[in-house]
């Protein structure tokens, strides 16, 4: 079976899901289950199980049975990210980490310098780092050199729902790093965006807002599940090459009245 492989572990689902912004913890849990996701992201700052206000959400997340992927959301320096990562490892008992180091409050674009610095230090400390990054090829290579075994390039700024804004760079990134697991993270707003990412050969997608803010989060979880599966199946089957001119699907050989119009 075609499975997702990350840091020596395999997963049936290629959809990763976030745990924030849902109308209620119960709807969050139902949406996660409907999506079929096996990895769920969470923030220590929002969902610290040691604090009373985070206990209810933590109980729901734990009951989902998903693998936990803590993130360093809100960190603006490598030092902050490393500190929060160590706290998350102690509290959530996992060395998996979605690394975020934000360089701009308006676009929430990752800070490439802080990201590489933090990735290098965290890899030395034994973390399995999945960095949230841009589609910049040079940056992605630096992250791999820093010890990351997978990458999480954005499709568009977080929460915008714009889909894949820079398809050329994303396509080039996929082509130049064919053996690196890559998860499109952030900016996906519709199931069709997820399908497109999978058709391009990306290994998985991670999203939150598109499901959490839908009118029916549970139904949207199902929609994204099917979209990811369809996109992956299409990629594996091999998409037809695009053409600049029309090509009839019905043969014209032997048709008595066919002629070419210039």
From Swiss-Prot:
GO terms for molecular function: thiazole synthase activity. It is found in: Cytoplasm. GO terms for cellular component: cytoplasm. Disulfide bonds: none annotated. It catalyses: [ThiS sulfur-carrier protein]-C-terminal-Gly-aminoethanethioate + 2-iminoacetate + 1-deoxy-D-xylulose 5-phosphate = [ThiS sulfur-carrier protein]-C-terminal Gly-Gly + 2-[(2R,5Z)-2-carboxy-4-methylthiazol-5(2H)-ylidene]ethyl phosphate + 2 H2O + H(+). InterPro entries: Aldolase_TIM (IPR013785), Thiazole_synthase_ThiG (IPR033983), ThiG (IPR008867). 1-deoxy-D-xylulose 5-phosphate binds at residues 159, 186-187, 208-209. Its main location: cytoplasm. SUPFAM superfamilies: ThiG-like. Its EC number is 2.8.1.10. Pathway: Cofactor biosynthesis; thiamine diphosphate biosynthesis. The active site is at residue 98. Transmembrane segments: none annotated. Belongs to the ThiG family. PANTHER family: THIAZOLE SYNTHASE. Homotetramer. Forms heterodimers with either ThiH or ThiS. Catalyzes the rearrangement of 1-deoxy-D-xylulose 5-phosphate (DXP) to produce the thiazole phosphate moiety of thiamine. Sulfur is provided by the thiocarboxylate moiety of the carrier protein ThiS. In vitro, sulfur can be provided by H(2)S. This is Thiazole synthase. It comes from Hahella chejuensis (strain KCTC 2396).
């Amino acid at each position: 079976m075609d499975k997702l492989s990350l840091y020596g572990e395999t997963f049936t689902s290629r959809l990763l899901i976030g745990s924030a912004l849902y109308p209620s913890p119960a709807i969050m849990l139902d949406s996660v289950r409907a999506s079929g996701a096996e990895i769920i992201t969470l923030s220590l700052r929002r969902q610290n199980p040691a604090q009373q206000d985070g206990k209810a959400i933590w109980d729901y997340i734990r009951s989902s049975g998903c693998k936990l992927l803590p993130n360093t959301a809100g960190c603006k320096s490598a030092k902050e990210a490393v500190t929060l990562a160590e706290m998350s490892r102690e509290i959530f008992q996992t060395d998996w980490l979605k690394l975020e180091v934000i360089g701009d409050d308006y676009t929430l674009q990752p800070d490439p310098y802080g990201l590489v610095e933090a990735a290098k230090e965290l890899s030395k400390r034994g973390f399995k780092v999945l960095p949230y990054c841009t589609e910049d090829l040079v940056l992605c290579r630096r992250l791999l050199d820093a010890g990351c075994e997978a990458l999480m390039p954005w499709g568009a700024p977080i929460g915008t729902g714009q889909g894949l804004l820079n398809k050329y760079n994303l396509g080039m990134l996929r082509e130049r790093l064919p053996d690196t697991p890559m998860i499109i993270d952030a900016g996906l707003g519709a199931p069709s965006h997820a399908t497109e990412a999978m058709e391009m050969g990306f290994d998985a997608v991670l999203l939150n807002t598109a499901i959490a803010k839908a009118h029916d989060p549970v139904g949207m979880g199902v929609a994204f599940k099917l979209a990811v599966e369809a996109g992956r199946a299409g990629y594996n089957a091999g998409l037809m090459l695009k053409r600049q001119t029309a090509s009839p699907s019905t043969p014209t050989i032997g048709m008595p009245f066919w002629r070419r119009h210039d």
